[in-house]
Amino acid sequence: MRRGVSPVIAGRNAKRLEQLKTEYPTIEARVTSTDDSRSLDDAFASIAVVINCAGPFLDTSAPLIEAALRNGVHYLDIAAEQAAVIAAFERFSEAAQRARIIVAPALGFYGGLTDLLVTAAMHDWTHIYECEIAVALDSWHPTRGTRLTGERNTGPRWFFAQGNLERRDPLPSRDWEFPQPFGRQEVASLALAEAILIPRHVQVADIRFYLNKLSIAELSNPNTPPPVPQDATGRSAQTFLVDVVVRKGQETRRAIARGRDIYAVTAPIVVEAATRILDGRCNVIGVQAAGELFDARDFLIALGSDQLTVQFGRPVS
């Protein structure tokens, strides 16, 4: 609504939708369910782009993409699960081309943001040897959706190494020297959507993604409470830093993003994407990664410093 569009909210919980309408009385609400294709078609009527923020995406992505295809509606989601992202590319690429729509999975903090940062760090490079992405969170209080996704996301983990997507064990934990205020942190290797998205449009041999173990410990603890809003926008007190290093030969380039609340920053990312699709700044169709769709640096800057602070430079040795 802040961007001047007229959103329609849709979901399976009629009571929750009514609560949202009480808070935002001008918004239209539509009850729908992923196991009812007719209700999905009704929900997508007269819609230009749908943003799926209802996980687990292993369950919701496919039926919503199918509905988007039937109704000629662009589809965006914020999945981090590799299997859901792989399925979007493998199952729906040709159909999305025929329907002349954009399907853009993983446009959230994990996946879309890091893909854009890698693309922006490369700048005018056409290929790189490797990229390393290290994320530091000062805490991780998971939402109920994150908990449900973790329970559902039990499939194989894929890593991108030596130019191939392959199933293997994670790399050993290591230390990463983050910029302040995080400093040196022990990080663990994880397999998320980055390994699927970045090779779609970047010629690269190796992709390594790390997350600081402090935040993993909180996520793994079933007693860690959900996030609590700390300001008028609903953001929690959580802070994050994403450190991206790309290498080509002996040269290195870097992009660093700082902000608050990994959940809250996802909203401006996916809404910026939807806005650019609606106003015609995307001239491609089909299933696409964020770095393919948008001018990465322009996109990141457009988010505004109140959401995300981004800088580019040389890595710290």
Locations of regions flagged by a protein language model:
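N-terminal Rossmann-fold cofactor-binding loop
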Residues: 10-14, 33-34
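C-terminal active-site/capping subdomain that shapes the small-molecule cofactor and substrate pocket
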Residues: 217-317
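ADP-ribose/adenylate-binding Rossmann-like module
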Residues: 56, 65-86
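Rossmann-fold NAD(P)-binding glycine/threonine-rich loop
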Residues: 61, 79-102
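Active-site-lining helix/loop region of Rossmann-like oxidoreductase modules
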Residues: 123-254, 264
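Short, conserved SAM-binding/catalytic segment
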Residues: 19-27, 92
